[in-house]
């Protein structure tokens, strides 16, 4: 792998505890972590977790609701990667058109990265579909990920609903 092509910065997120969302559902809470360190050696920078702003952008917040600076997040948690779109498609779900884009993310090998993790890239959240150790040499990971649909206040109010 030509590591000089890894020009993007991504943050891996792991599920930790569970929390209740605005609709009363129990959902996992995702926290940033350093994939190059064993979990027992990681020191948390405050209690930071993944949330979304009113426009549906993925953001990191402290437990008290204060924003965690994006530059600090990149400094503390990011790793080099190459993020490139693979395919896009639209489909109809519940009388709405949904767009889905799949991305290929290349990065150095990190032990323990799997489909339960998420990726944060430029305020966008990605669900990991598959993780491949290319060549089986523990040098490079190829991750296939799908961008999560943004959850906005308009989506939650159901303004697109005809009924």
Each predicted region: which residue ranges?
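Short, conserved turn/kink motifs that form compact alpha/beta structural patches or helix kinks used as
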Residues: 3-5, 14-19, 25-163
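A short beta-strand micro-motif
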Residues: 10-12
